[in-house]
Amino acid sequence: KRRKIKFVQADILNLDEIKSYIKEAKVVHHLAGITNVAYVKKESNPGQDENIKKVAIEGTENVLKSMNDNATIVFPSTHVVFEGLKKPKKNVDENEKTSTFLAYSSSKVVNENQIINSGKKYAIFRLGSVYGFSTDTMRMNIMPNLFSKIASQNGTIKLFGGGVQFKSLVPLIDVARCFKFVEESKKFNNGIYNLTKENTTVKEVALICKKINPELKIIETNDEVPNKGYTLSNKKLLDTGFEFVNNLETCIEEMITKWSYEKFDKNLEYTFKGVR
């Protein structure tokens, strides 16, 4: 059954514009923010960084000010609050000290603390890399989606350092399901939760793509990988009773199938180096 949704376009930095709408809500899903962000240090610039921080921090403050005292805020944070970890680490839990250096992740840490200290009821989710088919282009550079796109066109994936980097992933539909689950469950009591399903490597994702489309070409380089990264533990989330219903291979197969009919450069070659 389709729900009727009232849409209001307003500026999150304008408290007067948003307050009258937010104050009536029992649950606030705070997804507003700048999504065109740098993935690595060399891609960032001061102007962009300042805008990311302003929208994230001032916007969240306005949302919290607008909420009524009995409302709950559901907030999507990010796995990259650990991007500054110096050594590889598996199954990082919610008690691990955050370590950031980019504006996006640093702002998320500030947001987490704003929410925790606000006195409001909350559930904060540190999302893994969110994959899965959608009609927008926002997540096209997320590694599983990008690899699926390349595979759908019989392209070439070049794996930097053999693709040994660790990745924590989560299906898009399950993220939405989890946010809905918060509204229905009484087990989320002012906590931070890692919202991830699969812990894998870049190479393993590429191999799934090749399993689905054997025409895909994979090239591995011998470059040294200074830090393989980290993975997140989802034990705390699973203890609430939430269950995932999607998986990586099924979602990749769906993306490859749906994108395989588009015209595309068959000679495309892509090298994966990023951290998303």
Predicted regions and their residues:
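C-terminal substrate-binding subdomain of Rossmann-fold SDR/epimerase-dehydratase oxidoreductases
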Residues: G155, F160-R276
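Conserved Rossmann-fold NAD(P)-dependent oxidoreductase catalytic core, especially the SDR/UDP-sugar
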Residues: H30, E58-A103
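NAD(P)H-binding glycine-rich loop region in Rossmannoid oxidoreductase-like domains
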Residues: Q9-V55
